[in-house]
Amino acid sequence: MKPSPSFPEPVLIETTEALAALCDRLAAEPFVTVDTEFMREKTYFPELCVVQLGGANDVAVIDAQAEGLDLAPLGALFANPAVTKVFHACRQDIEIFLLKFGAVPAPLFDTQVAAMVAGFGDQVGYDTLVSSLAGGRIDKAHRFSDWSARPLSRAQIAYAAADVTWLRPVYEGLRARLTREGRLDWVAEEAAVLADPATYRTEPEDAWRRLKLRGGNRRQLALVKAIAAWREREAMRVNVPRQRIVRDEQIPELAALAPADAEGLTRVRGISSGFAGGKSGRALLEVIASTKAIPDAELPEAPRAPESARPPAGLVALLKVLLAERAGANHVAARLIASAEDIDRLASEDAPNLPCLQGWRAELFGNDALRLKGGRIALAARGRRVEVVDLP
């Protein structure tokens, strides 16, 4: 068992002056660990409640809702190119900071991604990393606390602080391992994606892609797209979860019925007469009416791939075997190398811009995947192992 490291006592930050002093100290360090606590159950946009920062001699729990607190010093720290910002599973945290400061903290390092590159598998949790790399244990008792309630309890402050204190030895352990294996550049490639604001951008016109659609004609597809885009904009405008505007399962039904009035809206299961006759109902009816007026020639093509475009099952199976072999041999999480969608597209089309054909993924898997697809290599079983065989 590794000796448990000693950490500074956590400090609650509630004033701009205290935050500025903290950020000044952390600006002199090579890295700082970061986490957030937020609420999103009742809003479209996450409500930032707490920010945790961990330095060599500082552990701070910042009350982001403290009256009069200006988070500008935090934004300056996040923009400092000399300080690496270390997160675990950073996407939701980054989304919050992008909304708050208009920029992604950089440079950044995500220990979840690093763990997948360092051989910890697909689904490793933060508590497992803390145990494996730092000999510690994470108390999950306050995981689902109401972080918007004030005052914060001592137990909440201790829980929040633990997320960034243990993250320091986790980061140092992962970085040392990746340095030995020559894989820091791999993690840097992933960090570049995480640092791109486009990664977090929500386009209302693409909202329909989250829905599970079955059948339907081109007109219905146009309606699904229009209704989903309207719902996304409306949810953003009033800052409520999109499901509180119109539920996912109601959108295909609305597209199929294409109601022309409030009474028609109420025929969709779960839509009340109050909604149908109100401002939102009228706006939805306008969207439906304008979409019904689109000429047939301008309707979108239904997203049904022809039989010839479906990925050949045999090739998909071979590519998955190659992926599993390369992931296992190199101790890298398979889903970080290539997704199921990547494999299907690789098997069925010429898609040179797929992530699995770029950078370290190409070296590890993509180049041989193309050779396998082109009939230049084969896969052979050797006992419990799978080997790549060059073909003449």
Swiss-Prot record:
The UniProt record lists the keyword Lipid metabolism: no
Location, primary (coarse class): cytoplasm
Domain 3'-5' exonuclease positions: 12-178
Signal sequence residues: none
InterPro entries, per the entry: 3'-5'_exonuclease_dom, HRDC-like_sf, HRDC_dom, HRDC_dom_sf, RNase_D, RNase_D-like, RNaseH-like_sf, RNaseH_sf
Domain of life: Bacteria
Single GO MF annotation: 3'-5' exonuclease activity
Every HRDC domain range: 217-298
Annotated disulfide bonds: none
Classification via Pfam families: DNA_pol_A_exo1 (PF01612), HRDC (PF00570)
Keywords: Cytoplasm, Exonuclease, Hydrolase, Nuclease, tRNA processing
GO biological process: tRNA 3'-end processing
Keyword rRNA-binding: no
Top class in the EC scheme: hydrolase
Cofactor(s) required for function per UniProt: a divalent metal cation
GO CC terms: cytoplasm
Subcellular localization: Cytoplasm
Reaction(s) catalysed by this chain's protein: Exonucleolytic cleavage that removes extra residues from the 3'-terminus of tRNA to produce 5'-mononucleotides
Function: Exonuclease involved in the 3' processing of various precursor tRNAs. Initiates hydrolysis at the 3'-terminus of an RNA molecule and releases 5'-mononucleotides.
Database matches in HAMAP family: RNase_D
Family under the similarity heading: Belongs to the RNase D family.
Name of this chain's protein: Ribonuclease D
Gene giving rise to this polypeptide: rnd
